[in-house]
């Protein structure tokens, strides 16, 4: 045999990553799409599976015939973009205050390299981890498969020891056995469990068995979670029947620029199972004790200071998701034809026609009518609409999409808030009660059946989809920049609206359902549908006053009854018999609140959904947000959303102890508002002219109503 020559390139790994990153940015050969909040990230399934144990577990658990789209909802889009950039470039840039959040995300995703990068940058993290002796080498072994355990008996130090992400819970197959079948090893796990030994060196390879051609279903093996198995591959995939508890959902009623959901549950909507990593309360590290997140939904009533003990809000079972709370709002989307083909339910695989009412009816089949729990993840809800909206996330069928950027949403309420997020001069929001004839002159070429692009002079048909298609011609999608002025934008929707400004065309958007129009006649017909529902539905026969809310109407009639003894039956004054069967939207809360506030001495507020009564407005508003899913307070550190001001203040104390108020001039932190006010006095003469003390709050208020009670 002649001389053997070894040819090796040190640049090959880096060049390979660069090419993969180019393919990702240009969406070339991408076989999976990760949906985080309102953004979609195309990627390569093999790259994600090799870089993060969470994705490896997720892809193997869903099977080969699963959909290409997966939802990751325990991370913000901005942070996931940074993590994805690290996967493809091995580099990550973030603020110092965000390191703790990135570190926790790396733990939940199972990204060993990112954890090591955090340890190398902050040596204190390495010293706080109670490292265990490794039982196997990490980089020389391949063909690994793991399941993160949710058992609290494993301290985080064991999971971070050395170069192994999951410590003793993650075991490796020797290189000679890397080509073995995963299904084969899974069947041998149970038989090898009784023969596993703790050895100080890598174990011998497991015995070979006959090959199995038929794939075996993934099963949960709770007994394997209590002890590490050496010489085998731990394959206890977590399902809804395992001991892995579903994560809390952190949903909000208003959305930031980059996200509309920041939940803490790792529920894969493509399968309806909980493929979740170890819970955050089971993965606390003393080194990051000050940055640990506090699940404020688990606080007792005394901690909230104003909560009614009868509400049981502090129970760990309660998970409130975004809900439109109105059956009528969904009716507007039936004619939109957003989904032109039947889609399978990701829970039971039943093929569902693209009809909103049928899909919602099918969602009720996955709700236990006796207990009010979700049959998929056993989450409990108090009201029916929240249950249905929650189950829609398991079904995995997006019912609504943005006309401009085609971002998918589960509810119309989420879509409407997404469109309200950006303010653009060429996007004119039209309300149902606005006079349309006065806006006729704002339409580009109102008297002409065609439109003309001001950027290139091309003649376009007066159709929004044609205009949208032409906008893409003036975009640099790869660089996410405008081809006319080279301005870059963080998200596609704002970029497309910006590019539309160069075209000289105005688009009118419906304030109710976010539909867009460039033809005045179509807009007029569409708004007529909303105007018929926006008209006053309740009329008083005594004084000719009109009301949109049944609660406000009934209270008004009760005043007549007190004064003149007239009949005030519940149906008195109804002009439309169909209203007896009509379910009122969520505005019934607001109508009742306003009616009761207007009367001095009245200290009771009654919820029309559950019948509970409250003595103060703050209590009633907090309770109302439970039914609507609104969380108007957002933490500036970890971007989580909360219902009340008291809860966000308690949460801020978990970030380094006293991140309550931050000076906008020098960045100084204060624990109380009085201390911050005194500190601001030092900067007299250098403060901006529009400075207000509210700018120092370490939380964002997304609701004007919630801003009525500022800090004192």
From Swiss-Prot:
Residues 134-147 have a biased composition (Polar residues). This is Zinc finger and BTB domain-containing protein 39. A zinc finger (C2H2-type) spans 372-394, 400-422, 480-502, 508-530, 538-560, 605-627, 633-655, 661-683. Belongs to the krueppel C2H2-type zinc-finger protein family. GO terms for cellular component: nucleoplasm. The gene is ZBTB39. InterPro entries: BTB/POZ_dom, SKP1/BTB/POZ_sf, ZBTB39_BTB_POZ, Znf_C2H2_sf, Znf_C2H2_type. There is a cross-link at residues 183, 439 (Glycyl lysine isopeptide (Lys-Gly) (interchain with G-Cter in SUMO2)). It is found in: Nucleus. One of its GO terms (molecular function) is zinc ion binding. Disulfide bonds: none annotated. The keyword Membrane does not apply. Its main location: nucleus. Keywords: DNA-binding, Isopeptide bond, Metal-binding, Nucleus, Repeat, Transcription, Transcription regulation, Ubl conjugation, Zinc, Zinc-finger. Residues 129-162, 176-224, 236-260 are annotated as: Disordered. GO terms for biological process: negative regulation of transcription by RNA polymerase II; regulation of cytokine production; regulation of immune system process. May be involved in transcriptional regulation. It comes from Homo sapiens (Human). Coiled coil: none annotated. Residues 30-96 form the BTB domain.
């Amino acid at each position: 045999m002649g001389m053997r020559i070894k040819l090796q390139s040190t640049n090959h790994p880096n060049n390979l990553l660069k090419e993969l990153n180019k393919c990702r940015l240009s969406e070339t050969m991408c076989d999976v799409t990760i949906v985080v909040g309102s953004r979609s990230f195309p990627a390569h399934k093999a790259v994600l599976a090799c870089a993060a144990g969470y994705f490896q577990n997720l892809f193997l658990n869903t099977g080969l015939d699963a959909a290409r789209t997966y939802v990751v909802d325990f991370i913000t889009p901005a942070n996931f973009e940074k993590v994805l950039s690290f996967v493809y470039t091995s580099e990550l840039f973030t603020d110092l205050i965000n390191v703790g959040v990135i570190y926790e995300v790396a733990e939940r995703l199972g990204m060993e390299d990112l954890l090591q990068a955090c340890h190398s940058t902050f040596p204190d993290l390495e010293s706080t981890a109670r490292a265990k002796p490794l039982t196997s080498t990490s980089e020389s072994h391949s063909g690994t498969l793991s399941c993160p355990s949710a058992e609290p008996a494993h301290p985080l130090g064991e999971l971070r020891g050395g170069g192994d992400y999951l410590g003793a819970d993650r075991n490796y197959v020797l290189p000679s056995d890397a080509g073995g079948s995963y299904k084969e090893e899974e069947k041998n796990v149970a038989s090898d469990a009784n023969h596993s030994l703790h050895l100080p060196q890598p174990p011998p390879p497991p015995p070979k068995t006959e090959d199995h051609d038929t794939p075996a279903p993934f099963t949960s093996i709770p007994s394997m979670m209590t002890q590490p198995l050496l010489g085998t591959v731990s394959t206890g995939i977590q399902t809804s029947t395992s001991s892995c508890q579903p994560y809390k959902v952190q949903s909000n009623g208003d959305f930031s620029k980059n996200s509309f959901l920041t939940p803490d549950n790792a529920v894969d909507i493509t399968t309806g199972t909980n493929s979740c990593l170890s819970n955050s309360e089971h993965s606390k590290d003393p080194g990051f004790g000050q940055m640990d997140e506090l699940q404020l939904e688990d606080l007792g009533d005394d901690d909230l200071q104003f909560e009614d003990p009868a509400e049981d809000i502090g129970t760990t079972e309660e998970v409130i998701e975004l809900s439109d709370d109105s059956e009528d709002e969904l009716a507007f989307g039936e004619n939109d034809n957003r989904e032109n083909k039947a889609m399978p339910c990701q829970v039971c695989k039943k093929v569902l026609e693209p009809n909103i009412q049928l899909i919602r009816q099918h969602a009720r089949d996955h709700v236990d009518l006796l207990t009010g729990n979700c049959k998929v993840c056993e989450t409990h809800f108090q009201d029916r609409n929240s249950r249905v909206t929650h189950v829609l996330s398991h079904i995995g069928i997006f019912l609504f999409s943005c006309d401009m950027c085609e971002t998918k949403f589960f509810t119309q309420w989420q879509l409407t808030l997404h469109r309200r997020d950006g303010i653009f001069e060429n996007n004119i929001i039209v309300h149902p009660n606005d006079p349309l004839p006065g806006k006729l002159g704002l339409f580009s070429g109102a008297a002409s059946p065609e439109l003309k692009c001001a950027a290139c002079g091309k003649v376009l048909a007066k159709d929004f989809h044609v205009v949208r298609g032409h906008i893409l011609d003036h975009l640099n999608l790869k660089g996410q920049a405008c081809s006319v002025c080279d301005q870059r934008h963080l998200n596609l929707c704002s970029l497309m609206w910006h590019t539309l400004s160069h075209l000289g065309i105005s688009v009118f958007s419906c304030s109710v359902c976010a539909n867009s129009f460039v033809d005045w006649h179509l807009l007029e017909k569409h708004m007529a549908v909303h105007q018929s529902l926006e008209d006053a539905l309740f009329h008083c026969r005594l004084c000719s006053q009109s009301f949109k809310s049944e609660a406000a109407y009934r209270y008004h009639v009760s005043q007549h009854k007190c004064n003149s003894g007239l009949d005030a039956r519940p149906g008195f004054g109804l002009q439309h018999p169909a209203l007896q069967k009509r379910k009122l939207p969520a505005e019934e809360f607001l109508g009742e609140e306003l009616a009761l506030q207007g009367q001095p001495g009245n200290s009771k507020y009654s919820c029309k959904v559950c019948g509970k009564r409250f003595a103060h407005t703050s209590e009633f508003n907090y309770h109302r947000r439970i039914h609507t899913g609104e969380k108007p307070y957002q933490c500036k550190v970890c971007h989580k959303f909360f219902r009340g001001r008291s809860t966000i203040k308690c949460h801020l104390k978990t970030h380094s102890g006293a991140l309550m108020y931050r000076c906008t001039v020098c960045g100084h932190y204060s624990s109380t508002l009085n201390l911050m006010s005194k500190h601001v006095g030092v900067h007299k003469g250098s403060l901006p002219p529009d400075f207000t003390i509210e700018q120092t709050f370490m939380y964002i208020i997304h609701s004007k109503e919630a801003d009525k009670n500022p800090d004192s």
